[in-house]
Amino acid sequence: MDAASGILPDYAELFCRSNFSFLHGASSAEELVERAAKQGYRGIAITDECSLAGAPRMHVAAKAVGLPLVVGAYFGVTPDDAAPGHDPGPGAFGLVLLAQNREGYGNLSELISWRRMNAPKGTYRLTPRMLAAPPRALAHLRGVPDCFAILVPTYPARADVLDAQLAWFDALFGERARLGLVQLQRALDGAHREQVRAAGERRGMHIVALGDVTMHIRSCKPLQDTMTAIRLGMPIAECGHALAPNGEQHLRTRQRIAQLFPADALAQTCRMLDACHFSLDDLRYEYPHEIVPAGHTPTSYLAQETWAGARRRYPDGVPDTVRQRIEFELALIADLKYEPYFLTVYDIVKYARSKDILCQGRGSAANSVVCYCLGVTEVNPQQSTLLFERFLSRERGEPPDIDVYSTPFSTDGRHACPSAFCLGTSPP
């Protein structure tokens, strides 16, 4: 607190794990957001361990109360030579990555996918080598561009170890690098705080206050202890120092936070919050551009293929009622800018049939004469009284579902078709 004015400094929590950090986080995304808003936080980050699973719920909850949200993730980083499953020693540290923009979110997503596909469940550790020299196919993830990187030192910090880590960290992440300070009312908090302060000063790196939050209120501590015991596979009474010594890993009051952290470290949380501009609302369906031939726009190509299909479906002439339906549907599709979606499904179906893979659209797509003319469905909407708006409407706010069913005997083809389409090459 500012002693002169009595005004509490602003604060944003940038290290917060929900119950999507399995057997670590004790509170739901909704509980965390509600508590942060009640405490008057400027914003909050969701940083589950090697996961973005909690981000959608956190996004919805934060949006409902007008609380700025940063999407990120937490990783344990162990020395390159540390044996899996063994104590990594003082060289280990925590890493909080925060997406600054959509590109950063994409890079963070790729990093998480890479680790989850290449590590046993629950052991999604990184090493300095992985971050600095990822495989060639993932070379663009070096230093995880467009993400803030916060080094969370092992407690209690050692000057020699921290200096070496910060030299490497600064070289890799540059201006995006920050040094995290966690204060949880433990015996060596004072010494830890001084080591972090001195190391940051020597390296010229900004220090940021972190709560290392795993629960929204202190009374969740028994639940967190229970989850720790389950994770370790032993009774609570035998967990000893593996249990958190107190309930400080909750969203504390701003008065308490102001007492624990230097003003600069608190101000840094808000500067980082303001520099992160990504929202899940920025995500949209994206479709390949290659499906539209040169000289066409998605609108003109969809119209061309639809009318060509109509002439095949109705060789004796397209009935006026069908013509009107086609014009109505094409106009609505163009207005909603869904042409790439319809063309993507059309391209998949064309590819499947070129390989004699039996497939057919079903469900509410049968309400659409455009789908019928494109050959996606085989039910003539003219012969039914189905409601087109059940399939596509302005109010829905997202592309319709077009289920393309492949028969059980074509399992290999069913897998090969989308794989080939996504890769842009024919399957072997």
Q: What kind of feature is each model-predicted range?
A:
Residues 18, 44-50, 362-366:
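Ser/Thr-glycine-rich phosphate-binding loops at phosphate-binding pockets of nucleotides
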Residues 50, 74-76, 185, 214:
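Catalytic metal-binding/acid-base residues of hydrolase active sites
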Residues 1-18, 28, 32-33, 37-43, ...:
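Conserved active-site carboxylates
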Residues 12, 45, 207-209:
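Residue-level marker for buried hydrophobic side chains located in beta-strands
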Residues 196-202, 341-358:
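Short, hydrophobic/aliphatic alpha-helical segments
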Residues 103-104, 208-219, 352, 356-378:
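Conserved phosphate/anionic-ligand binding catalytic regions in large, soluble enzymes, centered on
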Residues 25, 29, 51-61, 162, ...:
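Active-site-adjacent beta->alpha loops and helix N-cap segments on the catalytic face
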Residues 26, 52-68, 83-85, 221-225, ...:
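Glycine-rich loop at the start of a catalytic domain that most often binds anionic cofactors/ligands
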